[in-house]
Structure formats: C-alpha cells, structure tokens
Amino acid sequence: MVQPGSVPSLRLQELPRTPLAGEGNFVWKVPYPAGHDGAAVLKVYFGSRSPLLYLKKTVGNRLLTGRTSHMPRARFRTETECVRLWESHGFRCFGMHPEVRVEGLPEGGYMLFDWTPGLHFREYFKDASVPLEQRLATWRRFVPEWHRRHATAVRLSEPRLIHENGDVKHVMLWRDGFVYFDFEICFTSRDVRDLVGREILAYMRSVGKFFGDALYERMTDELVAHYPDKTLLLTAWEHAFRNRNPVVRAGRWLDVRLKPRHRQRWSKYEVALDIRQRLDAASLTQGG
C-alpha cells in the first residue's frame, strides 16, 4: 500500500504484463489498484527497434518530413507535452501518471497511462449492430470538436494540436465523449493550415479504407454539412493541390500523373478532389 506523500513505485520484473497493440514500443496492460478496473497501461519508449533504426528514422523525420525526433526519450517528451497541451484546450487524452516510478526502466523512457476500455472509432463505425443513424449522430457530434481543435491550432500556430498519426484508429468513444491518443511524433511546420488539410485527408482516407464506400459517402456528406468553417475544410484540397511551396506543388502534380496508386479511390488526391467537389456543390445549393 502506498503511504500518503510517498512516490508510487512498481517493479517491472514483478508485474504481470498483457501485451497490447504497439509497433516499436513495449505497451502492456498492468495491474494498478488505483486505476480503472484495477489496471493501467505501461508504455515503454525504449522498444524493440535498434538504436540505428531510431537514428535513421530521426534523420528522415528531421530532414525530410518535418517531424520531431524518433529517439526514445524525445518521443516520451513529445507525447507527454502533447497530452498536456491537448488537455489544456479541453481535448481528452489518456490520463498520465508521471508520479509513478517503475523500477527496472530508464527515467524519461516510460509512462503509466490510464486504462481506458473505450470503443475505437475503427471498430465502432463499422459495427453493424449499432444503428446507422446512431453512428452518424456520433460523427455529427465529433465534427464540431474536430473543427474546434483545427481552429485552435491555426489561431495559435500550434502544430502539436494536429494529430500526426491522425486517423480513425487513434480516437475512441469513452464515457459519452471522445478520447485521443498516440502523440509520440508531431509536425514541426508552422504552416498549420496545411497541416489541418493533411489531417482531414488522413482521417477521411481511413474512413474509406476501413468502412467502405457507402459509409464514406454518408460520413463525408455529414462532414461537409456540419464542419463549421468551410474555408478551413477546403485546406484538405489545398494540401493536395495548392501547396505554397512551388517545388512541393510540382512534385505532387507529377505524383498524380506518373504514379497509378495516386489515382486510386482512397489516395489523398482523390479524397481531396471529392471534398472539393462536395464543397462546391454545397456552395451552389446554398447560393441558389
């Protein structure tokens, strides 16, 4: 039993560990009496990858793709900073327990998170046992919150409010709200409007890939109807076709024409065009 004022401590070697999904990290469900269902999630950033691979990914992130470092302690810092930032603006994330020490693990290389047995978007929206209209109502409730985060990120020029790994795998329903997770890497660009467009495309591409055409059509209709700032929603198309950097813009022009995969149904270019066409149609309808 933890005494008042003492630092909670766990011993890694004594912990029963249930592996959870996680690529490159060690992520375990572990007993934690103070946690929900008597459990917590222990995430260890020093994972299964070699130091050379961490370094290689870091060089690519920093020099080529405009992302933060992939090194273990850097990912720990990025994730914990992002969780605090998102929560400070009212977006729920997995609760953290930085006060808990785990003997046998390096400081600054792990975090104990709340065990949160919610419903992942990826599973919820394709669950035919949930009435379609109920799922669409959930999506309509999500879209304004999604927009609020985008608008806050643009207003503050804060790239850390953009979900670098954003798709329907990294949002869940929990206690009548939305919970976000996976913040190990974030973007470094200050062109936050472009990052908003990129994230919108990433989410909607995953909607199509995981849920299929019929549900994609309905969810995209709802997105266009209920996303409050249509100009900000248009950044999805601008990200694909109107990048401010002429070199990037030219490269994407060539991408579409030279690589058949970029003309497939769920490529970012096809989804961007689809969103633009729906916005144009909505504008004409309202104008009429």
Which stretches of residues belong to each language-model region?
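The N-lobe alphaC helix and its flanking beta3-alphaC-beta4 segment of protein kinase-like domains
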Residues: 73-86
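ATP-binding glycine-rich loop module of kinase domains
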Residues: 26-75
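Active-site acidic catalytic loop and adjacent metal/ATP-binding pocket
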Residues: 26-30, 40, 148-189
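Conserved alphaE helix
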Residues: 134-148
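Juxta-kinase regulatory segment immediately upstream of eukaryotic protein kinase catalytic domains
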Residues: 1-23
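Conserved structural core of kinase catalytic domains
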Residues: 75, 91-138
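C-lobe/activation-segment region of protein kinase-like
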Residues: 179, 183-284
